[in-house]
From Swiss-Prot:
It is found in: Cell inner membrane. One of its GO terms (cellular component) is peptidoglycan-based cell wall. It is a single-pass membrane protein. InterPro entries: Glyco_trans_51, Lysozyme-like_dom_sf, PBP_transglycosylase, Pep_trsgly. This is Biosynthetic peptidoglycan transglycosylase. The gene is mtgA. Peptidoglycan polymerase that catalyzes glycan chain elongation from lipid-linked precursors. GO terms for molecular function: pentosyltransferase activity; peptidoglycan glycosyltransferase activity. NCBIfam families: mono_pep_trsgly (TIGR02070). It catalyses: [GlcNAc-(1->4)-Mur2Ac(oyl-L-Ala-gamma-D-Glu-L-Lys-D-Ala-D-Ala)](n)-di-trans,octa-cis-undecaprenyl diphosphate + beta-D-GlcNAc-(1->4)-Mur2Ac(oyl-L-Ala-gamma-D-Glu-L-Lys-D-Ala-D-Ala)-di-trans,octa-cis-undecaprenyl diphosphate = [GlcNAc-(1->4)-Mur2Ac(oyl-L-Ala-gamma-D-Glu-L-Lys-D-Ala-D-Ala)](n+1)-di-trans,octa-cis-undecaprenyl diphosphate + di-trans,octa-cis-undecaprenyl diphosphate + H(+).
Length: 240
């Protein structure tokens, strides 16, 4: 009986691995129609008896402002071009910070955030962390860095029910994602740690200060020229 259950478990695991690889390969070329986080937000609204309309319009790489691309990297993951999905230094710093108590600091890279938003549910269980690591590794192996950032910008939450750069630009500033200014992009990047509480359109003093920091980091990174590094970053042969 135990041997039978073990064989079934191994077979299920193999099917999951094959299926997840095929899904990640497909999404390298096909825009994701939605995300697990969007489904979760919709279910939450039904449970709370407060239905929301999800706003999201996919925009390809060339129709998103370079200002926003650089701002997000500057604010969220400055080692994005170099790492393979995990920032070990940031993880170690977060562990030390969290051991000292107080607020919990995260250390998620853009690649990890893509895997969470696309495929997983909210929470901090070991199972979820393991699946996050698995999908992050697959994304880094099979997607170029530019694709990872493109999917991130089209999937990340920027307010209650507002997902992706185009919806965020329209919602907060009344412009398209292609026309976001440096100031607007820095404000959108500044609220990403807590987009359902902080507002890019009505920024608090803290958000304004953080946006100023993001702009300084953008300048230090080299502005739009920094995006050229995405084409020169470390990638596996399969991501070429």
């Amino acid at each position: 009986m135990l041997r039978y259950l073990f064989r079934r478990l191994v077979k299920a695991l193999m099917w999951f691995m094959v299926g997840s690889v095929l899904l990640v390969l497909l999404l390298r070329f096909v825009p994701p129609p939605g995300t697990a986080l969007m489904v979760e937000r919709k279910i939450e609204s039904w449970v709370d008896n407060d239905p929301i309309d999800l706003q999201r319009t996919w925009k390809p790489w060339d129709e998103i402002s370079d200002n926003l691309k650089v701002a997000v990297i500057a604010g969220e993951d400055q080692k994005f071009p170099e790492h393979w999905g995990f920032d070990i230094d940031a993880i170690q710093a977060a562990l030390i910070h969290n051991e000292r108590g107080g607020s919990i600091r995260g250390a998620s890279t853009l690649s990890q955030q893509v895997s969470k938003n696309l495929f997983l549910w909210s929470g901090r269980s070991y199972l979820r962390k393991g699946l996050e690591a698995w999908f992050t590794a697959l994304i880094e192996v099979f997607w170029p860095k530019q694709r990872i950032l493109e999917v991130y910008l089209n999937s990340v939450e920027w307010d209650e029910g507002v997902f992706g750069a185009e919806a965020a630009a329209r919602h907060h500033f009344g412009v398209s994602a292609a026309n976001l200014s440096r100031q607007q992009a820095s404000l959108l990047a500044a609220v990403l740690p807590n987009p359902r509480v902080w507002s890019a359109a009505r920024p608090s003093t803290y958000v304004m200060q953080r946006a100023g920091w993001v702009r300084r980091q953008m300048s230090q990174l080299g502005g739009a020229d920094y995006l050229n590094r995405l084409n020169e970053s470390r990638r596996a042969p399969w991501a070429e």
